[in-house]
């Protein structure tokens, strides 16, 4: 994701942060990281209001963390409400055993 901005953690910035923790079988961790990375680079980053995303993998192989920033909750909601976005999110969830999204300011 060389063209995607790196996340900036600054309490003075007024952005919406999504922390999405996926629980995965260790043999599927790389698959989910690749799917998230490629889809973010090819599609998600082009949506209005997208700021940045960082994909992290746990050392034990059982988790993938997607730390994403959006300009506002309205921008994020608009993205999530699109049928194509719902398909992408379902694809990611299908690779994982569980997913725990948290929205933060």
Positions of predicted regions on the chain:
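An amphipathic, aromatic/His-enriched active-site/gating alpha helix that lines ligand/cofactor pockets
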Residues: 2-4, 38-51, 69-103
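Generic detector of low-complexity/intrinsically disordered segments
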Residues: 18-20, 34, 90-91, 105
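Short, surface-exposed ligand-recognition loops at beta-strand->loop->(often short) alpha-helix junctions
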Residues: 23-36
């Amino acid at each position: 994701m060389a063209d995607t901005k790196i996340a900036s953690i600054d309490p003075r910035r007024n952005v919406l942060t999504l922390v999405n923790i996926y629980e995965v079988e260790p043999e599927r961790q790389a698959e989910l990281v690749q799917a998230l990375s490629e889809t973010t680079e090819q599609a998600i980053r082009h949506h209005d209001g997208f700021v940045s995303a960082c994909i992290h993998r746990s050392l034990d192989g059982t988790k993938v963390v997607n730390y994403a920033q959006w300009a506002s909750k309205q921008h994020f909601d608009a993205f999530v409400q699109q049928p194509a976005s719902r398909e992408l999110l379902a694809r990611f969830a299908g690779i994982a055993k569980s997913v725990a999204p948290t929205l933060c300011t």
